[in-house]
Amino acid sequence: RVWGRMPADRLEFIMPAVSSASPKLTFAFVMDPVENEPMDGSTTIVMMREAQDRGHTVLYVDPDDLEVDAGRVRSLAVSITLDLASETPITKGEARIYDFDEEIDVALQRKDPPVDRDFIVATQIMDVCRKTIVLNRPAAVIAYNEKLLATQFADLMPATRVTRRIDELKAFMA
């Protein structure tokens, strides 16, 4: 199923229900430019919308703006509001510097590969957070290749071969 079409009650494992008495949280999405996300079918947009619909604050953080200052993760971030029915589905607020451990409750790493130096440095910066809940865990993001991780569950997937050798791939596909 495409997550963008999944009923909200099926998303409880990602975004727990919040009652009116529950504290409102600040979610920071560390990701490639939010304007480039497809508005239909993007799991990142679905999670942003769910957080917003539940009354939480949603921030967009460009990984290039992350920094560590005196042992604290900080970043320029901008609040966003989503209205997917509008001609302008993303409205940005004022950009300002946020101290992650003091102002951000949950940070979601949604940066797409390639796993290059910039990706690794941004991930390592996120690992400095001590109070902020960081999803996906930075050490795991670096340690496990997202494509190769699935091979640890071979009994749950079709026959798969990972190789750089073209002759092996051709033989496998035959």
Residue ranges: model-predicted function:
Residues 16-53, 58-105, 111-174:
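Active-site nucleotide/adenylate-binding loops and adjacent lid/helix of ATP-dependent enzymes
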